[in-house]
Swiss-Prot record:
Protein EC: 3.5.1.44
Identification of the protein by name: Probable chemoreceptor glutamine deamidase CheD
PANTHER family listed in its UniProt record: CHEMORECEPTOR GLUTAMINE DEAMIDASE CHED-RELATED
Lineage: Bacteria, Pseudomonadati, Pseudomonadota, Alphaproteobacteria, Rhodobacterales
Naturally occurring in which organism (per UniProt): Cereibacter sphaeroides (Rhodobacter sphaeroides)
Family: Belongs to the CheD family.
Functional description taken from the UniProt entry: Probably deamidates glutamine residues to glutamate on methyl-accepting chemotaxis receptors (MCPs), playing an important role in chemotaxis.
Entry keyword annotation includes tRNA processing: no
Record InterPro entries: CheD-like_sf (IPR038592), Chemorcpt_Glu_NH3ase_CheD (IPR005659), Cytotoxic_necrot_fac-like_cat (IPR011324)
Reaction(s) catalysed by this chain's protein: L-glutaminyl-[protein] + H2O = L-glutamyl-[protein] + NH4(+)
Keywords: Chemotaxis, Hydrolase
Gene Ontology BP terms: chemotaxis
Amino acid sequence: MTRCDDRPSASQISITHVTQGSCVASSSPNEVYATILGSCICTCMCDPVAGVGGMNHFLLPSADVEDAQHLRYGSHAMELLINALLKLGAARQRIEAKIFGGAMMTPQLGAIGQANAAFARRYLRDEGIRCTAHSLGGNRARRIRFWPKTGRVQQMFLGSEDVVPNEQPQFRLQGGAGDVTFFDRHNNAEMPDPIKEPR
């Protein structure tokens, strides 16, 4: 069968799993980033004109949103992602963001998911980066897939029987806009409102 468009075939797709503390960026149409989130946040950023995008995945060390020492971990994750996009040819004023995660997964983590979500929204607002979609909070884990070239995102909520990576705050600093499709795991149906937050 001959393809009538320039979309990559399944055999050409490269899926990179983005773990907590990671930051990745690409301009390849064959690249897909995937991650699973509980209390963590992932930020998907894209310059749709330059055709470059990237993802980070972070968890603040505590729920204290006034603790500057802790907030710098989230700021560092954001700055790494923005700088990676700029190196690939993005223009800062064109960068768009979509943010996901921040669920209340366990009592042991307390309100850290809520704090992560609040940090991400405040950071984007303060830096003048347009947030075109978000799905934050709730008590279910999320599986995210992101196409950095176009900014397309898919989200699927996971059930209690799914294995979610154990999330632990990381204290070590590293040196150095398409559509959103939402799926519910149990009926695999596309959710009608891509901006609606879970209850």
